[in-house]
Amino acid sequence: MADSHQTLRCPACGTEMQKIFVPAQGVNVDICTKGCGGIFFDNREFQMFDEKHENIDDIIQAVENNDFKPVDESLPRYCPACGAKMAKNYSSVKKEIQVDECYACGGKFLDHGELTAIRNEYENDLERTNDVMKYVYNEIGVELIHAEEAKRRISPLQRLFNKLAGL
């Protein structure tokens, strides 16, 4: 979903969000500068800011030196762009930071401080990808081990029956 020019309401605190233009990426990012400090990224915008080498000076300037109000992260949140209920997902396989994602339009909402925390999880995208690969390998490896163990526990008579039955 392309960035709209409409003013959005923060899904965490309901305050009107401010559009901050980030010239380096050529996009507007919606930031709750007068409420909780949350940031809403339209579909695919987040990928422009999630690594350490990507410039977020304009975002930092918009949120620095503010005393943001606390929010209840357990309450359901609705996408400020399309109104769909947002889902909580972990930002990485480390499962340390949860972000709110909209499956309808692809938007992402980060609570105050989460963008910096996500950027500090990995040095670069390659490190993130390697971590995902290790996680998947470990998960599949465990499943394969369980399958092999279950196969070994089958009695010879059961194996014969399975073979005759085409299982």
Each predicted region: which residue ranges?
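Cys/His-rich metal-chelating microdomains
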Residues: 16, 35-39, 85, 105-108
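Short cysteine-rich clusters marking metal-coordination/redox-active sites
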Residues: 10-13, 32-33, 79-82, 102
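Short, solvent-exposed interaction modules
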Residues: 64-104, 108, 116-118
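Short, intrinsically disordered terminal segments enriched in charged and Pro/Gly residues
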Residues: 45-69, 122-161, 167
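Short, recurring structural edge motifs at helix starts
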Residues: 17-21, 25-31, 87-91, 97-99
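Short, structured motif recognition centered on aromatic/hydrophobic residues
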Residues: 39-41, 46, 108-110, 115
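General detector of N-terminal leader/presequence modules that precede the first folded domain
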Residues: 2-12, 16
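Short metal-coordination and nucleic-acid-contact micro-motifs, chiefly zinc-binding Cys/His arrays
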Residues: 4-6, 25-28, 72-75, 98
